[in-house]
Amino acid sequence: MSPAEIIRPAAKVQLMDSKAHGNNHEEIIRAPLNYLLDLPGKEVRSKLMSAFNQWLRIPEEKLEVIKRIVMLLHNASLLLDDIQDSSTLRRGLPVSHSIFGIAQTINAANYAFFLAQQEIPKLEDPRAFEVFTEELLNLHRGQGMDIYWRDASICPTEEEYFTMVSNKTGGLFRLAVRLMQLASESDRDYVPLVNVMGLIFQVRDDYLNLQSTAYTKNKGFGEDLTEGKFSFPIIHSIRSNPSNIQLSSILKQRTTDVDVKLFAVAYIESTGSFEHCRKTLAELMAQAKAIIEGMEGDSSESLSVMNQILTMLGLDGNEVPR
């Protein structure tokens, strides 16, 4: 009997056994993912897609497919992010890998990527898989550079930071809207608006990490400092006075000491870096609103909804969109 003849029956038996006990196996495999899904979130991406659909008007069933794809990818990336960042809290509770272990959590995250891919044929457009692949590559490119800068202790420029964010954070926003555009009769390209929204989202997230009490409750105080991350205010602060190595030295320590982190936050404040964040966010908000207002033919209701979401992504209110 040839090796192929030996392998084929065994594979068939395993597949049949998997189906027979599928529900139990599925629960085990997905446990780290399901734990994360059960944690209360703000569903910002889902709200954004619903808002964009006032313009794109795609069928509800296809919108739900795209929402599932983005939800799976987003949560898969969070599972991996928490491992790569050595995080301890997610949405105020222990991270998945603290409960299920690193190996099982990585497997669940990878499984979620393929669950998302499995949804693509339901969109009935051969271009959808290309969009899916392009934006997942972008996401990993951005994440790769973020990790590299952190681990090599290299402070990027703001331009390099924005390129990374456009790939890492903007990737899922773009994926959602690009898939929606494939299913829409509208020929308008909303990607430029989505790109600006991705920047708003990440700059705000970086700001809140060091300034928000709500963020402290959900993720821990100054988590970016403990991680050693070159976030937007940290980049500005370091580059505002390159001869002062205090902040860059603190980042290398991966400190959990609250007093040291408070010292770092005070230093970042002293270099005007939080004010720089606020000004940058205001400029990005103005860009996004200008793009929206320049779209002819859209109803005032649609503009109102989008402006509300832009406000949610900005500094107004206490929303923490992670």
Curated annotation (Swiss-Prot):
Mg(2+) 3 binds at D205. Mg(2+) 2 binds at D81, D85. It catalyses: isopentenyl diphosphate + dimethylallyl diphosphate = (2E)-geranyl diphosphate + diphosphate; isopentenyl diphosphate + (2E)-geranyl diphosphate = (2E,6E)-farnesyl diphosphate + diphosphate; isopentenyl diphosphate + (2E,6E)-farnesyl diphosphate = (2E,6E,10E)-geranylgeranyl diphosphate + diphosphate. The keyword Cytoplasm does not apply. CDD domains: Trans_IPPS_HT. Isopentenyl diphosphate binds at K42, R45, H74, R91. Its EC number is 2.5.1.-, 2.5.1.1, 2.5.1.29, 2.5.1.10. It holds the Pfam family polyprenyl_synt. Dimethylallyl diphosphate binds at R90, K168, T169, Q202, N209, K219, K229. Diterpenoid pyrones display various biological activities and higginsianin A shows anti-HIV activity. GO terms for biological process: alcohol biosynthetic process; mycotoxin biosynthetic process; terpenoid biosynthetic process. Pathway: Secondary metabolite biosynthesis; terpenoid biosynthesis. Binds 3 Mg(2+) ions per subunit. It is an enzyme of class 2 (transferase). Mg(2+) 1 binds at D81, D85. GO terms for molecular function: (2E,6E)-farnesyl diphosphate synthase activity; dimethylallyltranstransferase activity; geranylgeranyl diphosphate synthase activity; metal ion binding. Its cofactor is Mg(2+). Geranylgeranyl pyrophosphate synthase; part of the gene cluster that mediates the biosynthesis of the diterpenoid pyrones higginsianins A and B. The first step of the pathway is the synthesis of the alpha-pyrone moiety by the polyketide synthase dpchA via condensation of one acetyl-CoA starter unit with 3 malonyl-CoA units and 2 methylations. The alpha-pyrone is then combined with geranylgeranyl pyrophosphate (GGPP) formed by the GGPP synthase dpchD through the action of the prenyltransferase dpchC to yield a linear alpha-pyrone diterpenoid. This is Geranylgeranyl pyrophosphate synthase dpchD. It comes from Colletotrichum higginsianum (strain IMI 349063) (Crucifer anthracnose fungus). The lineage of its organism: Eukaryota, Fungi, Dikarya, Ascomycota, Pezizomycotina.
